[in-house]
Structures are given as C-alpha cells and as structure tokens.
From Swiss-Prot, chains A, B, C, D, E, F:
rRNA processing in keyword set: yes
Gene: rph
The name this protein goes by in its record: Ribonuclease PH
GO molecular function list: 3'-5'-RNA exonuclease activity; tRNA binding; tRNA nucleotidyltransferase activity
Keywords: Nucleotidyltransferase, RNA-binding, rRNA processing, Transferase, tRNA processing, tRNA-binding
Pfam families: RNase_PH, RNase_PH_C
Subunit structure: Homohexameric ring arranged as a trimer of dimers.
Gene Ontology biological-process annotations: rRNA catabolic process; rRNA processing; tRNA processing
Top-level lineage group: Bacteria
Catalyses which reaction(s): tRNA(n+1) + phosphate = tRNA(n) + a ribonucleoside 5'-diphosphate
The keyword Chaperone is annotated on this UniProt entry: no
Purpose: Phosphorolytic 3'-5' exoribonuclease that plays an important role in tRNA 3'-end maturation. Removes nucleotide residues following the 3'-CCA terminus of tRNAs; can also add nucleotides to the ends of RNA molecules by using nucleoside diphosphates as substrates, but this may not be physiologically important. Probably plays a role in initiation of 16S rRNA degradation (leading to ribosome degradation) during starvation.
Length: 238, 238, 238, 238, 238, 238
C-alpha cells in the first residue's frame, strides 16, 4: 500500500477555484491534495522582440515557490538574485505545454503571461501548475473574446498534466512528496484531451525502468489526465 | 466622502486566518479589505554570523509580491535578479517592527525568519504584513514553548501597523490603493499595545503637511492600531 | 551631557562649499561636524521612459559611501555587485525630499541626477546629503537659467533635513555617530523653509517613544532646519 | 527521405577520441557527425556541503557552448552574467544520467566534475555530451584506480544517449540541427547497456505524438544506444 | 638552461589551422606548444550604439578558458556569473591589438566579433590569441570581400604577439606556464609586421627590471614576432 | 606646444595631503593638476583564503570614480551591479605596483586594503592613484609600527607612477585628459626610487610607436618619477 493510502490508480482530490484573485485576466487556485498553487494569466499587449511584426502572439510562463511552501524553508530566489535550474526547467515546461493547445496566430500581437506560484507544496507542483494554468489561460482568453479584442479563441483543446512513478516496483499515479522522494522512477506526462502526448519527462531515480513499466505508467497517466480534464471542464462550466 | 465610502476613521474589515499553510511553524493569512498577504514565521536553529556565540536570537523578514498581485503585472524579482529598493525598504521595516516586541535573549541562538508574500494588493501591504506577521511569530513561538525549546516567551507585547493619510485635506485612516495614489500625505505608523510609537514613516506626496495634520493622523492611527491589536488577540484566542 | 558636549538643541557646525568639483553643473561639499559629503547635481537632457513625451522633467538621486568613510571599512558596493537595502532606502529618500520643492513641469524634458558620496561619516549622512544636495541642485538650475534652457526656476522653496533622537531620555538635535548608536529613538525630519513637513522617519531602537517625545523632537527639528536653511541661503549668496 | 540523406534508423558517424587535452583526469572529444564536444572529467578531493561526512562521493556536470559553435553567434554566458534555462536543464540532465551508473559510495568523499563544452553544434549536443562524458568519467575513475585511491570502480554499467523524433510523420534516429528544427516531436533517450531507461524527455513541437509513435521511437533509440555503447567500448579498448 | 630545454631565443612550435569549425566566417585553431586556442571571427551586421550612423565598423573580442584547460580546474565564469578581472583585461587587449591593423572606415557599419577560447593552456594564451585571431579576422574579411559586401580590405598589416621574460636573470622568448610562473619579469609585446610597437605590458613579478633587460627582451620579441607573422602568412597562403 | 601649455618634460603640480580623512590608518588626498584622488590604506587583521596559515601578509587595492568626477556623468558601478573591465584592470595594476615594494613576510597575517577613489578626473588617475596610495600605505605601516604590531617595516622602497605619451609626434610627460584623448601613444610607467621598472603598459592608440619613441618616453618617465618620489618624501617628512 502506498504511503498516502490511495490505490495505485487513484488521483488526489482536485479543486479548481476560478477568479481567485482580482486583478489578473485569469486567476485560478488549484489544489491537488495538499499542493496549492495560484495560477494567473495576464494579457500583455505586446510580443517579445523575436516575434515583433509577425502578426502572431506568444505565451510564456514563470514559476515560483513561496519560501516556506516546503517543509524546510528554501532561500527566496529574489533575495539570492537568481532562479535555480529547477525553476527554469519547470517554467519552460509549463510554457511549452500551454502553447501546444494555442493557435498563436489567432491571438494577435499580444502575450499571455502565466504565473504559477506555489503556496503549499506536496509533490506534483509542475503538473498541477499546467492543469491549473490552462484554466487561467482559458479565462484570460474569455476576457479578450468578451472585449472583442480577438474574433475566435486561439485555444485548440484542453491540456493537463500528471505525474506517475514506480514505487516499490508498482506503477502509481499522482505521487505526493513522500511517495516522490522514495520512488524509483518519476515521470511527468502532459496530454491533450484527445490523449495526444505533448511532453513526457521520466527519470529513473534508482533502478532504470523498463518499457513495460513505461506502458503501465502511460496507462495510469491517461486515466489521470482524463479525470483532470473533466475537473477543468467542470470548473469552466461553473 | 472617500472613494471607498468609508468614514475617515473607519478601518477596512480585517480577517486573520491562522494555520493557513501546513509547513511553517506560524502561518497566517491576513486580509485587510482586498489586500491579502500570507505571513509565515519559520524557526531556523542558527543565528547570523554577527550574533554567533552571543547567546541571543534574531528575527528577520523578507517581503515579496506575486507578479500579478497588482493591477498591472510587475516583473518577477527572482527573474530580474534583484529586489527593488521598495522591497528592501519594506522588509527592513517589518523586521525592525517585530524585533521591537521581542526580547531576543530569551529566544536562544535561533532565528525567526518571517516571510510576507502579497497574494493580492490594494494598498497598505507593508502595514498589513506587520500586523499579520506578529500573529505568525506568536504561533512559531508557541511551537517552541510547547516543544520546551525555550522556557519563557520572548514576546513582550503586541505590535501592529496601519497607514494614515491626508486625502483632499482630510486626515483618514487605512488608505486603500486608490486613496493612497491620490492622497497628499501617506504615513505608516507602527505601535505597540500600550500605544508606544515604534516606527513612523510619513511622506508628503503633494503639499507638505503641518504638525496639526500630524496630530490628527496620529489620533486616527492610535484608534486603528487598537482595533487591529484586538483582531490579533481575537485570532490568537480562537 | 551628550557625548559630543553639545547642548541638546545645538547643531554641529555646518560648512557648505560650492563649486567643489569642476565638471558637475552643481557641486557642493557639505560638512556637518565630521560628516563630509560631496553632493553633485548633473543635468541629463532626457527623462526616464515612464515620463517620455509628457513635457515634464525628473529628479533622481544616488548615494554611496567610500569604503573607508566609516570606522570599520565597508565592502565596496560596486565590488559586491549590489547596493544594500540601506543605500537604496537613503537614495529614494533624497530623491523624494528634493522633488518636494521642484515644479518638474518647469524643468522641461530633462533629469537632474543627484549624487551624494560620503567621504567621511560621523552620523547624519542622509540628512546632510539632502541639505547639501539642495544647494547643488540650485546651482545646476542656475546653469540652466543662465543658458536660457529654462525660463523660470522650477525650485519652489528650500528643503533641508536633520536628525533628532532621544538619548538617555532627553530629546536631542543632530546626533553624531556615537550618539546615534546609543540612542533610543532616531528620527530624520525633512522640512521646507515654511516649516512644512516633507518626510519624517522615526525608529524606536530601544523603548517605544511617546507622542510627547515626538513633539519635543519636532520642536528641535524645526529649530535645526531653520539654521540649516540659513546656512544654505548664506552659501548661495556668496 | 531525410535532409541528411540518412536512413530513418541510421546514426551519424561517431568518433570518440580519448586523452584529447592534457590536464584533466579524463578528456574526450566526441564527434557525432558535425557535432563536436570536449568532455572532461576532473577529480575534486571534496564533496558538496550536503554530503560532507557521509562517506560517499558525488558527480556533477556543467555544459557550455562556444559562442560561435552555432550558426548564429550566441551571446557568451560568462559575459551576460548568467546561464540560460536551456544550459541549466542540460547540465542537470547530464549529471543525473551519469550518476545512474555510479555507485557513489565506492567513490569516497570526492567529486567527479564533468564539463561538456560544445566546440561545434549540429543538433544532439546534450545526448552526445552524455555519451562522451561517460568515457571521460571512465578514464578519470581509471586514474583513481591506478593511484589506488579507490579499491573498486564505482561504475556499474555503460550509459549513452541519443535523440529520436518524428519527422514528416516518420520516426527517425539521431536528428541533426536541420532535422531537429523541422520535426514534430523531439525526444532524448538515455539508456544503460542492458537497455534500462534512465531518462526520457520528449516534446511535441507541432502535433502531439501517439503511443504508437513513442513505441517506434523507442525501438530506434534502443538500436542507436546499442551502437553508441559499442563505440564507447571500442574507444575504451584502444 | 630553461625548463622547456629551448634556447633563450627559441619560440615554441606554432601550428595555425584555418577553417577549424564550420559556422564562423573565420575559424582558426592556434597551437603554440601545448597552448591550444580556438579563435573565431564572426561578422555582425551592426555596430555598437556609440558608433551608430558614423559610417564605420568596429571590432571587439571576448576571451574564455574551458574550466579544465588548466592544471587545476577553474570555476566556470558563466556559472559564477561574472568574468574575472584577468579575463576582462585580456579581451580588452586582444580587441585593441587587432583594431591597430584595421581601417574601420573600410568595414562599413558592421562589427567583427572575435572569440578566443582556450582549449588547453600552457602559458602565453593572450599572445597566442592575438596571433591566431588575426588569421581568423583575415578569413572573415575574405568572406566579406568575396561577397562584395566591402570593396577593399580594412586590414592594413599583420599583427602578432609574443611573451618575453627574465628567467633566472636571462631574458627569454615565449615562456610556457612553468617558466612564466617562476620568472622575474613577464612582458607581452604586440607588434605589426613593420615592427611597430602596438602594445607592451610588462610586470616585474619579483625584482624590478632595468632598461637594459627591456632592450634585450624587445630584441627577442622582435625576432619572435617575425617568425609568428611568417607562420600567419604561411597559413594564409595554404 | 601642448594643450596644457606645459613643456614636454613638465609634470603637473602635485599636492599630497596626508590624514585627509579620519578613520583610515592611512588617508591621502593626491592632486595632480585637476586630478584629485582620495587614497586610503586600511589594515585588516586577516589574509585571503589562499594565504591563510602561511605566515605572510597581503596587499590589495580597489579603485572607483565618483559618477560625476568626469565631464560626462558615468553610471555608478554599484548601481549597475558590476565593475567595468577598465576598473578591474586599474585596481589590479595598483595592487601589483604597491606589492612590488612590500616584503609581505614582514607584515604578519594581515592585509593592507587600499582604496583609490577619484573625486575629480583629468587624466592620469591610475598613475596618481599609485603615487598617492604609496603614501597612504606608508602611514598605515607607521600605525602598525607605533602600535608594535610589527617589528620592522615591510616597505622596501618608494614606488610611483606617471604617464607618458607621444602627442603630435613629440614624446611628452604626464598627459592630462585632453592630451591623452588626442595622443598617438599612451604609456603608464611604474618605477621604484632606484629607477627599476615595475610595470609598463603602453598602447598605440593611432600609429604604432618605435623603439626610439619608447626610449624617449622612458627618459621622460624617469625624470617624472624622480620628482614624484621627491614629493612623496616631502609629504612624509611633514
């Protein structure tokens, strides 16, 4: 049995709260078990230099953790004066994942700036960031549509992410911190609503994993993504 | 009448939620109107170099704003690679204010690290940080007392802070963002529960202010601080 | 009796030397007792981005200390690669204080860049910087008037600053380093020549201070500011 | 047909030159087609702080590109003052991949510091870095064994890496720059000599990829890794 | 006898390999004994701000060492986040030396960006960088001439550099690392092909040197420069 | 005739004021014509890591310019967050020059930290820094001798520095800013009182210089150094 007492294929409970803060065009609190992240999507009426004049938009993401979102207080990155490699890796992943369901030519010359800030961490912050940020982006696009700043939505489908892993030889879905820190393999999967693979990043922390392990993990991920996209749709319909 | 429709001497509604996040020894969400700040107090079992071996503790504070806590998205300080002068000024103020009610010799050689992170900003973030952080520190000290790491509380009294200002010639209590950006004088007052002055920082944004204005602002501040300390006590008794 | 042997209401001797260095439009050496600061005002024929095209000017200030201006050598901020929080706080204060007596719409689209560099420190460097920099700005404006770059002076009055404190229970004017490091309360007051309050920043280092202490400190400050503005006028008439 | 005229399952020609530079304990030039990388392994007789006193060793990696290793000159990271997110991501990957075949308890309290510096880039620099660095590490360990600094090798197997992708709908092995920049999916696979998966990082640049695509890519990768490990063994036997 | 067994006036063997890497307009590997440096010259179709619109070009240089190009691994400057004073000093020297034989008005509004990256160091890296970079610049200019981007070559002559020193009282040419670290005086000389002096930088590491020592060192340098320029010409004729 | 109306072999007037500021163990204002520099020498009772436990001392130097010491205001290096290549080059030169007349084994395990801060610049700031800093170091050593912290002076002789150049074909001594910016060759010479050469750094800004030019420049430098060392001795005898 896993430390969290969940079944191997059991997701943590997910809550997606829209309009969580007041200023952003899209603002979502996502809670996956004890992991809590504020995801905002801000509209910036310009594009980065490399896209200027090309008639298309951009989406980019930043990620941060409150210093005491974790069990041991981490040093504040703003005070240290630089973002860690882990932070950079995660924010690049979030950006790529969200762009995979955006037709940026329909956005016009503007940028959707996503911010994912972890209030409380219990594993899976990068995947929850993607799942939550999709809803925030959806709301920001909704604002643009209502203002008639764009004619059609650039969003081409849903995208969500979940972690899977091999814990004591058994493939498992949606690892919390304790499970993650003890597992042999840790993999993050990003999928669209038609179950196309957008990103997969797997690391064998201890033993290498086999292609059979991989298949079982992908089965679990597929099921988890389906539930997470259902939760996104649910939240967007409220 | 002021933009917020409040009376000149009327504080915004204050909510202090303890145990807001799970990991920190003290964790508080303070809400003053639309201003929402997470204040955590973490215990670090060492002191900075300049105090090592002196048999006393230390308390220090850091402050940050989520990029989209404000109306316009601000650049993330971690991404920019440095904290602004404003951030540094505020975190130094929070640290001094909280140390004013701490007998650090009773803390032992450990540091209370305070983090104030603004989730949503509507004026008065530095004063709300102080008011909320006091409660988080109180809870962190409580943890140390329960673990018998210290014998007696180092806390010597309550401390809270509030802003006052002169808006269209009339002194007013607890300015929100709109009031703050239009007022002539903006002053932040930090006081203890016996109404001793700990910090005062006043700036004439437009016209200089007179000693008479100052007196009226101090009267308002005194009343506001009383109410805020009552809210702190209330929260600590729950 | 105070360590400096001065009476509680006695300012240190003040010397203001204009045209101290050759290149700047305004260049002043101010000496307050053993505190010696070079204040220069440079004219830059452009404004920061946020003011471009608005038909008004700007004034900004920077502050630094020579590494061995103090008793213990401080690390050079340029070598460390960042300015301390204290430095940032002081230079923001100097800028605000000087802007309080400038009608920036009369300056045209140019910036007055003030630099205050402490050659020797003995307490009160931020207040002496303000008092000295005012004269440097006055000279820089004089250059612009003589060149007919502007038609009328943007300067609307004098501004000067002084510290006050409570030392062993007695309010005192213009603390030197020794007095400052032992006092209970330390307050910096910035006033105009009609004794309007522009900035006040008070900190209780030990015991909180009362409103009665505050009143006595303000009386002292008022008297000190009057003498400092007389010294400015004296220097400007030479 | 692919731009490089290779068959879909055809690796670029691989050259591994040992003892390429004189100072490092292990120094390898790896050439995969036009991609050329110097990989060195240096022995440092201490471990990072977090491992001090734990009786085990560490392996860490850094990665860089000469500014004109690419078609367009890139800004020198040392001059810019920071490493890009891409650089950090790659060097973290190289370190994890190499540690997967190291029993660090057999290394003693020392660190193997790997440096991978790209002299000329034509796609696949991160995977070639891993393949080449393994040989450099092997040589550095050889030095320690010959000096009898360690008793048994900490190396538990071979590790190598290769890229695979989907180019115009067809899965392909070992993409060069041109192929990489036009392909729909780009995946980097790290495997051991018993074909255990150590890392997989796949990104759909255009269309999401299916599990069937993934299977075909893994088949290709498996074959490529076999050939690369044969090349490593070949080089180590010379 | 000197540690390297060479005669006092004997240069190390020099190899200049053109077209060493594929992307740069000029790319040279220079080997002086065990010192090996990749020198590239890249053409950038713009000039720095201070030259914009002046109808002339610019040439600038950067210098770096691979972390393990030296006997002890050096910290990577990109990871440290800043270039050392030594690095800055060397790259400024390389730029000045190369500009001394360039008529920048004939280059048009473009910049030649030189990069000198030390693959293996054994003394004399800054002088070998200059000698090698000249050839790379020559090739980059050749590219511009062939493309008819410029009409006439901006190159006005050859430039090369060599070190001389006083080792155990005897002036010697072209010091390797061992000789350099033990010598009393270390001097770098940059000369044109008509033996005009462009740069000389001499440092007495131990005893000061006399004008007689200086004369003997200059005689040696003159001879060395002649041989190095012959090697440049040789390489350019191949 | 030269712009400054001086004869080719005429030094600017030199003033060396000791005890210029109060806190440093040695504090000197040196004025060479309009160039004015504060040179302080501070005693630090420890040595850098690389010398710890070796029973010898160290001397190091830092250099800075006040932002408006020059005709155009320069950006403050502390605000920019890094020192320029020029600054680093100069402070390394000052350190080497002063160490050339120090027997560091007689200093004990302490560091002399030299700071040269340019108050007003008119050419020759690096050479004046060396000449002035020698006197400050002499005073700091005097303090150590008086306190009997050391038994014998580590100072082995005088050191001073001067610039020479070729201006319109004529070698000249001690260039001011105007002369320096128009001259063909600019050379800085550091010599001891027995006229041993410690450093020479010459750059042909326009035409290369000949060995004959060099000889004439060295004759001028020799004479200038003699006068500067006489001024140092004079100041030290007052």
């Amino acid at each position: 049995m896993r430390p969290s007492k969940r079944r191997p294929d059991q997701l943590r409970s997910v809550q997606i709260t829209r309009h969580y803060t007041r200023h952003a065009e899209g603002s979502v609190l996502i809670e996956c078990g004890d992991t809590r992240i504020i995801c905002t999507a801000s509209v910036d009426e310009k594009v980065p230099l490399f896209l200027r004049g090309k008639g298309q938009g951009w989406l980019t993401a930043e990620y941060g953790m409150l210093p005491r979102s974790t069990n041991e207080r981490m040093q504040r990155e703003a005070a240290k004066g630089k973002q860690s490699g882990r932070t950079m890796e995660i924010q690049r992943l979030i950006g790529r994942a969200l762009r995979s369901v955006m037709d940026l030519t329909k956005l016009g010359e503007r940028t959707i700036q996503v911010d994912c800030d972890v209030i409380q961490a219990d594993g899976g912050t990068r995947t929850a960031s993607i799942t939550g940020a999709f809803v925030a982006v959806h709301d920001a696009i909704g604002t643009l549509l209502r203002k008639q700043a764009i004619e059609a939505t650039p969003i081409t489908g849903h995208v969500a992410a979940v972690s899977v892993g091999v814990y004591e030889g058994v493939p498992m879905l949606d690892l919390d911190y304790l499970e993650d820190s003890r597992c042999d393999t840790d993999m993050n999967i990003v999928m669209t609503d038609d179950l196309g693979l957008v990103e997969m990043q797997g690391t064998a922390e201890g033993m290498p994993f086999s292609r059979n392990d991989l298949d079982m993990m992908l089965d679990l991920a597929q099921q988890g993504i389906r539930e997470l996209i259902a939760a996104q749709k649910n939240a967007l319909n409220r």
